Amino acid sequence: MKACVFPGQGAQFVGMGKDLYDNNPLAKEMFEMANEILGFRITDLMFAGTDEDLRQTKVTQPAIFLHSVILAKTLGDQFQPDMTAGHSLGEFSALVAAGALSFEDGLVLVSKRAMAMQKACEATPSTMAAVLALPDATVEEICASIKDEVVVCANYNCPGQLVISGSIPGIDQACEKLLAAGAKRALKLKVGGAFHSPLMEPARTELAAAIEATTINKPSCPVYQNVSTKAETCPETIKANLIAQLTAPVRWTQSVQNMIADGATHFIELGPGAVLQGLVKKINKEMTTEGMQ
């Protein structure tokens, strides 16, 4: 069975989507529609901006969403996955690709999500760190041991690769303890703030109202959501999981394992980069993977 997966923040690069825009009339039309909806020419930043432009959360998230979703739309009838999933932001791309969300509604929600997250990051300086080669339980235990600071596991990317999220002093303390416990690496990431942690609560509250007011349809195939890790098709459950996602961890390892248990054998990553293909292979080396961008 075929699974289509969609990347999240961090996969962006200058020039992403330009080939699509230049060579496919439908893609060009959709990119121009996006420029109108957003009220600025995001295509200028995607195709010819600077890395710094693209690193701004309010630009990064809609840019990656557009690249992924427009790519899926241009495939037409060739795009017929048996199941989909997206990593963090990529979950919105997966829902649009599966017909649960309209392109316009998806873009508006992603833009609101990005703005709300950027605002929360500016209100409380915070960060994230990648942790390599420690069991999940050890990382969880160390995060829980840090008192008076927010430190949580935010991304379960593949066995032996987690991302933690929290306040800057909390992450600094956690990195020291993790290295002492034998982590191969505990490295702070260049991100705007503590995504998928309780520090995103103001953004979650803001986005919840927008998600509640948006129509979500039954998807054409199951969407494996980050929060539940299971195949979801019920619009109300999808909404609840989308709202919870901002302050909850991305359980990617478990999601991919569940997709495989349900019959997935071939994973196609749609959008910039090849991060998810690498993670799928680390979760189960028997899987075949390919990327489209």
Language model features with spans:
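FabD-like malonyl-/acyl-CoA
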Residues: 1-139, 189, 266-293
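Alpha/beta catalytic cores of group-transfer enzymes, especially the acyltransferase/condensing modules
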Residues: 9-11, 38, 98-247
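A short, flexible low-complexity segment enriched in Lys/Arg and Gly/Pro that occurs
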Residues: 62-68, 245-252
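Short acidic/polar active-site loop segments enriched in Thr and Asp
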Residues: 82, 149, 184, 265-266
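A short, acidic, amphipathic alpha-helical segment used as a generic capping/interface helix at domain edges
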Residues: 249-264
